[in-house]
Structures are given as C-alpha cells and as structure tokens.
Regions:
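Gly/Ser/Thr-rich active-site loops/lids in small-molecule metabolic enzymes
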Residues: 132-136, 140-176
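ATP/nucleoside-binding phosphotransfer catalytic cores, i.e., glycine-rich phosphate-binding loops
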Residues: 110, 126-129, 178-228
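Conserved small/polar residues in nucleotide/adenosyl-binding loops
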Residues: 1-5, 226-227
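Short glycine-rich anion-binding loops that position phosphate/pyrophosphate groups of nucleotides
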Residues: 32-34, 57, 144-146
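N-terminal glycine-/serine-/threonine-rich phosphate-binding loop
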Residues: 4-44
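Catalytic core of DAGKc-family lipid kinases
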Residues: 57-136
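Gly/Ser-rich helix-loop-strand patches that form or flank binding pockets
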Residues: 37, 41-59
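Short gly/ser/thr-rich secondary-structure transition/capping motifs
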Residues: 8-13, 122-124, 170-173
C-alpha cells in the first residue's frame, strides 16, 4: 500500500500514472461513484480493487466498514474472491479524427441535452445497420452496468461473467422497445444526427463531452477490472 501526504485532501486524487508499479491492491473508500472513478483511473492495469462502502449507494461496494479489517486480512492472505468485470472503451470520432477516448465500468450513454427534443441516433453493430433510434438517448452497458441506468430504461440484467454488451434505448418513440444484447466481441457505432450540440456523451454518469451532428461514438469491450 502506498499513501502519499500530498494527495490527502486533493480534489483530483491520484493520477493513473502515479499509481506505483507493483501495487497489488487498491482500497476504494466511498460509494459506487467512487468505485467507478477508481476503475477508470486504473483501467488496463491488473490491480484488484477492494471497495468499501462509505457512501449512500453500495450496490458495487459490498464490503461494509465493519467488515473492512476481516475482509482486508483475507485479501492480503490471498483468500479473498476476486471477480473479473469487463470494461468498455469508447471513442468520439469527428471528421475522421478521434477527439475523445474513454473507459467505462458501467456504461457509455449518448443522450439529449436538457433543452433538446428527441434525437436521432443511427446505430451499427460490426458495421451492420441495426436501427435509427428516435429517442432521448442510447445506453451501451457492460454486464456490470446492466443493473444501473440500463435497468431503469427497461434493459435486461446480465450476470457479470456473461460475455456481452447491452444496447438499451431511452424513451424511444416506438410502440415496442426492445434492448439488444450483442457479443462482447462486437464493435458498436452510434452516429448522432442531432443538430448543433443537442447530444451529449456521458461515461459512467460522471464525465463526458458534447457531440455535434455526424459525430461517431465507437464502443467496444476493453480491459478486465478485478474487484473483491
């Protein structure tokens, strides 16, 4: 474990490149939002996360404060169960150039801005046209994220070990709303047809950027995250 005084009280926390080589465990103190931020911070590095729930919502952070020391002792002794969870990689492509790159544990969402009406989102899976959704947005979620925003929008619950990605429309203007589950080897492409900056990309509900018309959001499975 490495604790540096200069990060105590820092609003920016610990940068990914500052996590020392050889780190064997990252203890996350907080709620699910803290865990999501930590997952993105160490994405691509095979360092298990040890999440302890100090927040209000602890769906992913199942270890309570009372369980901290007994569970931590098990983890240090190598007796703790480690669960692999697949993450998502998303890119924003504008005029043929990548202008944004993100990692997500839960989901990548293309949605409307506050004052926008429904937006049109052309959707492709492995270069094959699926549909143009006229909706408030589109959620691309991992199995972990299937119990988050996607569930609220009527998406299915996927077991964390399932090798799949879920595509869930948000309030689509249609008589039937059916989420689509595709293999995690698929490449999903969403083309925003919303004029101006009426569409917005959100990653794990925490970070994102505005999209302009004809921006392409390309999503695929990326690295594994390991949690206790």
């Amino acid at each position: 474990m490495c604790i540096r005084d200069r990060y105590i009280g820092s609003p920016n926390g610990l940068a990914r490149e500052d996590v020392p080589e050889g780190t064997q465990l990252v203890i996350v103190l907080g709620g699910d939002g803290t865990l999501l931020a930590a997952a993105r911070a160490i994405a691509g590095r095979e360092i298990p996360l040890f999440p302890v729930n100090l927040g209000g919502l602890g769906f992913l952070t199942a270890i309570t404060l009372e369980q901290l020391y007994p569970e931590l002792e098990c983890a240090i002794c190598g007796e703790h169960r480690v669960v692999p969870r697949r993450m998502l990689h998303g890119e924003v492509v504008r005029n043929g150039k990548t202008v944004g790159s993100y990692e997500a544990l839960n989901d990548i969402v293309v949605g409307k801005t506050q004052i926008a009406r429904m937006i049109d989102l052309e959707t492709y899976v492995d270069s094959q046209f699926v549909s143009t959704f006229k909706a408030d947005g589109l959620i691309i979620s991992t199995p972990t994220g299937s119990t988050a925003y996607s569930l609220s929008a009527g998406g299915p619950i996927l077991f964390p070990a399932v090798a799949a990605i879920c595509i869930t429309p948000v309030c689509p203007h249609t008589l039937t709303n059916r989420p689509v589950v595709v293999p995690d080897t698929s490449v999903i492409e969403i083309i925003s047809k919303a004029p101006g900056k009426e569409a917005y990309l959100t990653v794990d509900g925490q970070v994102g950027e505005p999209l302009i018309e004809d921006d392409r959001v390309v999503c695929r499975s990326s690295c594994l995250l390991y949690t206790s």
